[in-house]
């Protein structure tokens, strides 16, 4: 049994961490922080969590006593918190973008923030970095879009049969966070599909960085906001470097992800409702046209495999628990 703290527990990702950890047999949540809701029972902010006696606390990184802390804080805030935790010997899974990049220059260019406290971190996509995650003190949890996009493209890059991708992702409104904006205001996003940051989304270099660890790639990425609460459906287009048929591509994906506990290669086209609420990524389609354009589709829940579930998966690996502990349940179809 380990003790866990959550810094920034009042948002959607913090709430998902609390929900998922309620049934984790190896974890006790000892601290859930929130400046806004200090002293307020967790169940008032997260009404589905009625079985917890936790109250939000307004405590700093120097006051939390835990074996591991999840930092579910905005970009730019984590870099001010994480070094204090690491210095005290507390292992960290950071859900912000502050530690995802190999160099601070890329972070500063795409996030527009000067990085004040660079640290060595392991990028927390278990399907690539499982061994490094196991011994890491700091794991940088991947972004939601990169998780779905990387998993959709990875086998083709590994096999050197594709090196250029056009990636289109449709995301639910919860990906924008708990604070409403003009973009996510109901009258604007309902009955609408909204492309945004069409050529300059900050998850683009994150996707490129991780795929290029295997082989150099070129890619374009465009996200769209759609009027659903949860989920990311990613469609990756690529022109194959070899002549392959649909069945051959499916075989490559099935072989590559064989044994992966949370990646499911499926027949047909994945759907958001099949993975909603779960830590699974479904990958399918694998269609090829007469120009050797291959189309791969992946589906994840942006709050689970795209955030909090993957963070717990990383924690499980770090502490030698069963990787599926607390996460081994299906989605909530329909």
From Swiss-Prot:
Q: What is its EC number?
A: 1.2.1.38
- Residues forming the catalytic site: 144
Query: Could you state one GO cellular component term attached to this entry?
Result: cytoplasm
The record's InterPro entries line, in alphabetical order, gives: AGPR_AS (IPR023013), AGPR_type-1 (IPR000706), NAD(P)-bd_dom_sf (IPR036291), NAGSA_dehydrogenase (IPR050085), Semialdehyde_DH_NAD-bd (IPR000534)
Statement: the UniProt record of this protein carries the keyword Repeat: no
MF annotations from Gene Ontology: N-acetyl-gamma-glutamyl-phosphate reductase activity; NAD binding; NADP+ binding
Pfam families in the record: Semialdhyde_dh (PF01118), Semialdhyde_dhC_1 (PF22698)
Enzyme class at the top of the EC tree = oxidoreductase
Q: Name one GO biological process term.
A: L-arginine biosynthetic process
Which pathway is it part of? Amino-acid biosynthesis; L-arginine biosynthesis; N(2)-acetyl-L-ornithine from L-glutamate: step 3/4
From the Swiss-Prot or TrEMBL record, state where the protein is found.
Answer: Cytoplasm
CDD domains, per the entry: AGPR_1_C, AGPR_1_N
Q: Which UniProt keywords apply?
A: Amino-acid biosynthesis, Arginine biosynthesis, Cytoplasm, NADP, Oxidoreductase
Q: Which reaction does it catalyse?
A: N-acetyl-L-glutamate 5-semialdehyde + phosphate + NADP(+) = N-acetyl-L-glutamyl 5-phosphate + NADPH + H(+)
The record ties this protein, via PROSITE patterns, to: ARGC
**What is the protein's known function?**
Catalyzes the NADPH-dependent reduction of N-acetyl-5-glutamyl phosphate to yield N-acetyl-L-glutamate 5-semialdehyde.
HAMAP family, per database record: ArgC_type1 (MF_00150)
The family this protein is said to belong to: Belongs to the NAGSA dehydrogenase family. Type 1 subfamily.
What's the name of the protein?
N-acetyl-gamma-glutamyl-phosphate reductase
Gene behind the chain: argC
């Amino acid at each position: 049994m380990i003790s866990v703290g959550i810094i920034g527990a009042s948002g959607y990702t913090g709430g998902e961490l609390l929900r998922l950890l309620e049934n984790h047999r190896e974890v006790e949540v000892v601290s859930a922080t929130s400046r806004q809701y200090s002293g307020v029972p967790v169940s008032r902010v997260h009404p589905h969590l009625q079985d917890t006696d936790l109250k939000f606390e307004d405590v700093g990184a120097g006051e939390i006593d835990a074996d591991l802390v999840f930092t579910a804080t905005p970009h730019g805030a984590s870099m001010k918190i994480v070094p204090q935790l690491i210095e005290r010997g507390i292992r960290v899974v950071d859900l912000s973008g502050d530690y995802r990049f190999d160099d601070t220059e890329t972070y500063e260019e795409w996030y527009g923030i000067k990085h004040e406290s660079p640290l060595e971190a392991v990028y927390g996509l278990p399907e690539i970095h499982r061994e490094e995650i196991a011994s890491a003190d700091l794991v940088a949890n991947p972004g939601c879009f990169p998780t779905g996009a990387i998993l959709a493209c990875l086998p083709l890059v590994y096999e050197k049969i594709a090196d250029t991708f056009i990636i289109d992702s449709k995301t639910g409104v919860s990906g924008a966070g708990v604070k409403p904006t003009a973009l996510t205001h109901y009258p604007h996003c309902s009955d609408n599909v909204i492309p945004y940051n069409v050529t300059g989304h900050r998850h683009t270099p994150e996707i490129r960085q991780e795929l290029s660890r295997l082989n150099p790639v070129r890619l374009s990425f465009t996200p769209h906001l759609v009027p659903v609460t949860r989920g990311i459906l990613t469609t990756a287009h690529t022109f194959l470097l070899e002549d392959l048929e649909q069945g051959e591509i499916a075989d490559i994906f099935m072989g590559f992800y064989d044994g992966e506990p949370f990646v499911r290669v499926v027949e047909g086209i994945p759907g958001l409702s099949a993975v909603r609420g779960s830590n699974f990524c479904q990958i399918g389609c694998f269609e090829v046209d007469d120009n050797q354009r291959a189309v791969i589709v992946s589906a994840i829940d942006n709050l689970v495999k795209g955030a909090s579930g993957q963070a717990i998966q990383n924690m499980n690996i770090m502490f030698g628990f069963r990787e599926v502990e607390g996460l081994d349940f299906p989605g909530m179809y329909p």
